[in-house]
Structures are given as C-alpha cells and as structure tokens.
Amino acid sequence: MATLKPPESQLLKTLTSILTSEKTHFLETLNPYIPQITQPLLTSLLSSPSLAKKPETLVSFFQWAQTSIPEAFPSDSPLPLISVVRSLLSHHKFADAKSLLVSYIRTSDASLSLCNSLLHPNLHLSPPPSKALFDIALSAYLHEGKPHVALQIFQKMIRLKLKPNLLTCNTLLIGLVRYPSSFSISSAREVFDDMVKIGVSLNVQTFNVLVNGYCLEGKLEDALGMLERMVSEFKVNPDNVTYNTILKAMSKKGRLSDLKELLLDMKKNGLVPNRVTYNNLVYGYCKLGSLKEAFQIVELMKQTNVLPDLCTYNILINGLCNAGSMREGLELMDAMKSLKLQPDVVTYNTLIDGCFELGLSLEARKLMEQMENDGVKANQVTHNISLKWLCKEEKREAVTRKVKELVDMHGFSPDIVTYHTLIKAYLKVGDLSGALEMMREMGQKGIKMNTITLNTILDALCKERKLDEAHNLLNSAHKRGFIVDEVTYGTLIMGFFREEKVEKALEMWDEMKKVKITPTVSTFNSLIGGLCHHGKTELAMEKFDELAESGLLPDDSTFNSIILGYCKEGRVEKAFEFYNESIKHSFKPDNYTCNILLNGLCKEGMTEKALNFFNTLIEEREVDTVTYNTMISAFCKDKKLKEAYDLLSEMEEKGLEPDRFTYNSFISLLMEDGKLSETDELLKKFSGKFGSMKRDLQVETEKNPATSESKEELNTEAIAYSDVIDELCSRGRLKEHSRSYTS
C-alpha cells in the first residue's frame, strides 16, 4: 500500500469515518472531498480493514468513485478493483465479486492488465493473490469467452500448488472445448492431466466435457479411451450424457456395429436408454439408409414408453428425403400433426430441400407458402436452401439478385453456408479464382471457414494441380484454428499421388497421425490405392496391416487395390495368395476382382492358368463382357483364333454384347496375319455397333482393367483402324469400304 502524507492520513480517517457511519446518504457527504482524493488515497480507502467489514458500502463507494473521480483510476492498473474484490470474497460475496470483474474485463481490460497483475504480482499487490481471487478471476474470464486467458491463470495456480475447485476446473474445460481453436482439445487434455496431478476430485461432468471435445473433433477412439479410463482408472460411473455423446458421434460416422456394442455396454452399466439415445440410433440407421430398421427403433421407443418427439420425426423425414421418398416424408409430416406435434422450421427445411433435390421446384415453393401460412418463420437455412438450388441451376446472376433481396428485405446476413454455396457454384463452372475470392471475402467479414468449405477448396486446388497452394492453405488452416479432418488430409494425399509425388503423400499421412486425426477406411484406401498404383505394394501391405490393427474393417476397394498392385508388378502368385487369404476373412470378390486376376495371368503369358481360372469363374458366377474380352485378347495374342471365336460365340449365346475391345482383339490379329477378307466381315459387323459403342467408350475404359492402364492402350482401337485404312489404301479399296463404315 502507498505511504500517505500526514494531511492525507487525516483525510483517510475522515473519509473512513464517513463511509463506516450509519448515515444513509453518506455518498453525498463525500462530494466536497473529491478534489482531494488522489490515487494512493483511493487505494488506501478501498483496502481499509474497517471498510472491508461493510462490503455493500465498499462496492457503492467503488462505483461512486469510478464515476465521480475517474482520474484516480489508472487505466493500466486493476489494483483498486482487486482491493474491493478481496473484501467481497472475505465475506463470501462471490456473485458480486465476479460481477465487478466481468464488468472490468468487458470495458477496461483490453491489455489484460488484470491477468498480468495476477500472474506477475508486484509489491503494490499485497498480500499475494489468494486461491479464491484466482478462482473468481478465472471464472470471470471464462464468462467473457476468454478461455485462453483463463488457462494462463489456471497454470499459475498449478505452479503455486493452489488446488482450483472442481467447478472452476470443469468450467475451464467447457470453455476450452467450446473455443474455436485447433489447440482447444489438446489444452483441455492438459488441464485434465493437471487436475489429476494436483488431486482435484473428478466427477462425471469432467469426463463428459472431454468426451464431447473428442467427439467434436471426430476423435472417437480417444473418446472411447476416456470412457474406459473413467471407469477402470478413476472409478467414475458414466451417465446417459456420456454414452449419448459417443453414440451421436458414432451415428454421424455411420458406425452402426460399434453403436450397437456401446448400447449393450450402456445397459450393462445399469443405464436405461432415453429419448436422446433412441434418436441417436434412429439417426444412425437413417444415415446408412436403413429406414426399415429406423422405424423399428421408433416402435421400440413406444413400447418402452419413450414417446418420439419432434426431433425423432425430423430425423425420419430427413432419412426419407435422402432416400428420395418425398411422398412418405410428406405423409409423415401429416402424421405428426395428427399427434399434435407441430412441424417446425427444421421439418419444412428438410422437405423443401428434398423437393429441390428431386427437381420438384413447384412442390418446394408450395411448401414455402404452407410454411408461412402455418406461422413458421423462414430462417437462415431456408434462405440458403433457395440459394443452393439457384446455384445448382447455374443461375449465378439470379443468386446475386436473391442475396441482395434477402439482405435488403429480410435482414439476411450471409453466413458460412451461404459462402459455401457460392464457392461451390463458382467451382461448378470451373471458376476457381471466383471461389478463392469468396473465401477471401469470408475472411474479411470475420466468417470462419468450416471443414466442409475448406475441403471443397482444397479438392478444387488439387484438381487444378495447385498443390503448393493447397498445402499452404492447410498450414494456414492450422494456424487460424480451423478444424481439419481425415477428408482434408485424404484430399491432399490423393492430390500428391496424382502428381506422382509419393513422398509428399506419405508426409501428409504422417502429419495426419501426428495431429491425432484418426483415418477412416476411405482415407486408408486413398493411401493404399496410391501406393499400389506407384508400384509400392509391399508398403501398401504395411498400411493394410495398420488398418486392421486400428480396428477398422477393409472394404472391397482395399482388397482390390492390393490385388491390382501385385498384378501390375507382375507378382500374380502373390496376388492370388492375398486373394485366397482375404476370402478367409469374409472378403467377397466380385467380377472386378476376378477380372484383375485374370488380366494379371494373361499379361504374364500364363494363358493355361488363365483359362483354368476363367473356366472356374464361368462355373461359379455370372461373368461379364470384360471377363470374356480378357480371355479373347489372350487367345488372340497367342494366335489361337479358333479358341477366340469360340469364346465370342459363347458370350453372344449368353446375351453378353461384344464391344469395341472384343473386336479390336480380333482385328489386330487378322491384320497381322493379312486376312483382309475376314477383317472386312468383322468390320462390317462392327460398323453397325460403332455409334453406340462410341458413347460407351469412357464407361468401358473405366470398367476394363485389361485396357485402362495407359493412354497408349486406350488408343488401340484407333491404331487398329489406322492399320486397316493403310492396308486398304495400298490396295485401292478405301472408297468401297468407307461406304460400309458410314452407311
């Protein structure tokens, strides 16, 4: 406390006497003394033990002084405030103390002077801050949405070995999890670890906050790990909130088998599923398109006296709309009304969007009118739906007019969804610069880009081969606190593979794991497929093993990528080993898989083995044109024309239509052997099919592993025709044949 001069000491006694008197209008008595009240005198008054015994008087005097003698309050010093707060805390006036701190933080703490005074107390702040002062300041910063500042105070308490109370800790965890930063969850985890070290007794809310944080970031494995720890290590029983949080995250990811297992675990722990639990199940089934099962869950709800609510019906209607069942969706809305459940804006938005999705613009407009008639006010989502469908109809000028109309007439403020819609519209017409301009405009307006928009821009940059820009955008996303996910990294991994930058793709994979983003099967498939395509199948197998160890189940794409990788490397025996082993683990190969293997055998000149495998296939399954084409091509390369013709007849008997690849195999062989008359006949037969085949070129190319490996192979038909034309020209018969090709 500052030392006062003798006159000031006497004045201090006088003012203290006035303030501690029983007079009701004591503040008016102070007015004549205003010119004499200096900053040191004010600090001494606020710290007076006599005045501290009267907290209400102290607060009244403090507020009077702030208005009457503002010059006595230094802008960079919260010491007068701290003096008042100490007094309030000593009398357990916690709400009043917090209110004063919140007001100060809101209006006078731009430079974080309060926080700095607590973190670095000097001689003027005596005694040092107490645990109660730290607690209440931490709580005030959280109230004002500044968990990063509150975290510094918490860390100071830990260094001083002051144990924060549980409520303070849980409030800090909630603030961090809600704060939009890429470091929020890791910071929350550090707070949790400090709570454990310092001996704070944890409760179920502590764990629920962390579980929610992990789920928000898509880190389901970490959430499940926390669930296991709370029971086994900390002996804290999870509640419905714990389970429902994880169930919701699982349902969003479509992990229905895991969801069922967790539901069983929930019941084992004596918890009864509530409406939120059932709604998560309904959502999970709808997400997978299993509408029958979703409706069965609703029936189960009714049987267990848990009535479906508006949320339940909205989930079902959304599921029906996603399945294109608009009539059933509209009927379900009518059923809601009969149950006295009034459709809300979510119900209408879902149905309106569903109608637009199916091209039912008129019905969508009618629903908008019905919505207005029912007194349901259109919201931001409704407007964004309208804009989205204008964009899909490629009416960008109409979109611009619509946005202006909504802003002028309805107070509409473009949000992240609006900008995402506009960005997609620009990208749809190939205007990447326009999309990037929209992204910059978002930043200028302080609208934070969400993960979906970020991924959309990254995908466009990768497709435009602007990988450096894409990588820079990812790095800036981390720095600016954007949430990235496995799709973000998967997009860049695919982009680098497309540009033959295998090492960069692997770096992205390692970085994804470093920031603790859990890859999905799709992400693994991107990596495995890319490695196999670039001749690194053994490394792909390591990633395949990693996938299995992570608890994920490989899908058909995973197995086919490995098989194709081995075949491309000429290691057909290894491909068959993997194929046979995969079948033991529930892999069900389709025609695509079998065609890869058959083509692998043929490419390596193993025609006899290929024929044996082919015969096995036609006995066990309905093969397709590609299967026959592969075998016909092998026979033609071996100059076994009769066997090739036999297969051609066989496939036609089975109703399989020969295509350009079928005939190309024959033409190549016939031309090589100089059999022009047979070539003539085949070309005439082929010319009638040429028109339809031309339209199917892209589809056939994508389907046929035997002919889709390089640009050179894609041009085999053109080469064959060129050879035919050269030969005909040399014999003077081009005019005659050109008539047959164009007739």
Swiss-Prot record:
Keyword line: Repeat
Protein name stated in the entry: Pentatricopeptide repeat-containing protein At2g16880
PPR repeats: 130-164, 165-202, 203-233, 239-273, 274-308, 309-343, 344-378, 379-414, 415-449, 450-484, 485-519, 520-554, 555-589, 590-620, 624-658, 659-689
InterPro entries in alphabetical order: Pentatricopeptide_rpt, TPR-like_helical_dom_sf
Record carries keyword Repeat: yes
UniProt keyword annotation of Chloroplast present: no
Source species, domain of life: Eukaryota
GO MF annotation list: mRNA binding
Cited Pfam families: PPR_1, PPR_2, PPR_3
Family: Belongs to the PPR family. P subfamily.
